[in-house]
From Swiss-Prot:
Record-annotated F-box domain positions: 76-125
Protein name, per record: F-box protein At1g53790
Pfam family membership, one: FBA_3
InterPro entries: F-box-assoc_dom_typ3, F-box-assoc_interact_dom, F-box-like_dom_sf, F-box_dom
Organism (species): Arabidopsis thaliana
Matches recorded under PROSITE patterns: FBOX
Length: 444
């Protein structure tokens, strides 16, 4: 059973936690914590059949609200008879920002929310919730600013906007980084100058870990990291693909398992190829497009089995006209690909791999709606992916004046523009937009 939560002033370590999670100045965050705890208490009461009069819920005093006073939380006793496993189940259903605040309520709550089994449970619950949009802004110094938001309810009106949740800032030493697609709540980035150095970061916790440097054969050797997940063994791995200006020279690549802080690269063999796209992991298989070398066209989809660490290949015929701008997607559990046509009028090509062994793809071409020119105008857009509802998500490469994302429904041919608010400070900044982000409190 869990002991009572009583008035428990925070010591210096707790106040450091508060500052870490952005709860300064104290007055406004305390009100937010009080509101969030009250909402959490009501959920617990409903689950346990406890009346409000039985909880002994005491509000924070005005004295506590005065700025500069030590942060104290005076909630008592509604958790008296609730087992820890039930508390963890309840905590796992609230947003990550609330968890960050709840860790500062008392040492008891902090101990619960820091448990490895709670972090595993939170990750499981995040995975079954609707995935989030993740926005990563990169300033001129290379610093990364992370925001997330749920998708809007589609269809929505033309004035729809989203206010994203802001996470921690990642400070980098490289003025420009290549940002990979998120997986299991983590992101892998690689510096433009330091091609042998990769960093794994968690936007929610602000934690980042530099991986051991990979071995480069020459100064012309390039690297591209990918994240892959094995759902059977529940292992997250980093695959580092190497390529060179000289064709057919790099047949050794490296893979690393992210677990227990023991990060060691292992060498694996694969025929030389040059990656052309971001990767996507579907049921333990990591996919990305590639050519035979840097200057060659897209001629294959590389398939990497994350568990066995074996490669296979799907040939891309010339007549498919798949190019470097192609975006791979998860279409109802199958590999799909989206790409704009190069010729005017612009259209959208959509492929789905229906039989990998026989290399059979279906293909559709969609004309863009007349509203396209009015809403998009001269904005250069990237294909981000596809939602579970079948809408293609498009995003700006760079924030110029306002930041918009677009939803193109393939069935209705409708186009919806959604403004992302509170990011105006990142004007003329590179932005990476990703689908399928899940919040995660795990450490590496």
């Amino acid at each position: 059973m869990v002991r009572d939560i009583v008035d428990d002033p925070l010591d210096e370590d707790d106040i450091a936690l508060v500052k870490t999670y952005g709860l300064v100045p104290y007055s406004a965050p305390i009100k937010k914590v009080e509101k969030e705890i009250k909402e959490l208490t009501e959920k617990i009461n409903d689950l346990c059949g406890i009346k409000e009069s039985d909880t002994g819920l005491a509000p924070l005093s005005k004295q506590m609200m005065q700025e500069g006073q030590p942060l104290q939380v005076g909630y008592v006793s509604c958790f008296r008879y609730i087992p820890i496993d039930l508390l963890m189940d309840i905590f796992s259903r609230v947003p990550a920002k609330s968890i960050a605040r709840f860790r500062c309520v008392s040492k008891l709550w902090e101990s619960i929310l820091c448990r490895p089994d709670f972090k595993e449970l939170f990750m499981t619950m995040s995975s079954i919730r609707p995935p989030l949009l993740l926005f990563t802004f990169q300033d001129d110094d290379g610093n990364l600013f992370f925001f997330s938001s749920p998708h809007p309810q589609i269809p929505c009106n033309e004035n729809t906007s989203l206010v994203p949740t802001r996470y921690h800032v990642q400070h980098t030493t490289d003025s420009f980084s290549e940002i990979g697609s998120p997986l299991c709540g983590f992101i892998c980035r690689r510096g433009k100058r330091n091609l042998d150095t990769m960093v794994i970061c968690n936007p929610v916790t602000g934690e980042s870990v530099s991986l051991p440097k990979v071995e480069l054969k020459s100064i012309n050797t390039e690297t591209r990291p990918y994240l892959g997940y094995d759902p059977v063994r529940k292992q997250l791995k980093v695959l580092c693909i190497k390529s060179d200006d000289i064709p057919n020279t790099c047949d050794e690549h490296q893979v690393l398992t992210l677990e227990n802080g023991n990060h060691l690269w292992r060498t694996i063999q694969c025929k030389p190829h040059y990656p052309k796209s971001d990767g996507i992991c579907i049921d333990g298989i990591l996919y990305y497009t590639a050519g035979f070398d840097m200057r060659a066209r897209v001629s294959m989809v590389v398939c990497f089995d994350v568990r066995s660490e074996k490669f296979s290949f799907i040939n891309i015929h010339v007549f498919m006209l798949m190019n470097d701008s192609c975006t791979l997607i998860n279409y109802k559990g199958k590999l799909g690909a989206l790409q704009f046509t190069c010729l005017s009028p612009k259209r959208l090509r959509f492929w789905v791999l229906v039989n990998a062994e026989k290399n059979i793809w279906t293909k559709c071409i969609y004309a863009l709606p007349p509203l396209w020119n009015n809403l998009v105008q001269h904005t250069e857009l990237a294909i981000v992916g596809m939602t579970d509802g079948g809408e293609v998500v498009l995003s700006q490469y760079c924030l110029i004046y306002a930041f918009y994302i677009y939803y193109f429904n393939l069935e209705s041919k409708s186009l919806t523009r959604v403004q992302i608010q509170d990011v105006e400070m990142f004007k003329r900044t590179r932005v990476y937009t990703s689908l399928g982000y899940v919040e995660n409190f795990k450490l590496m």
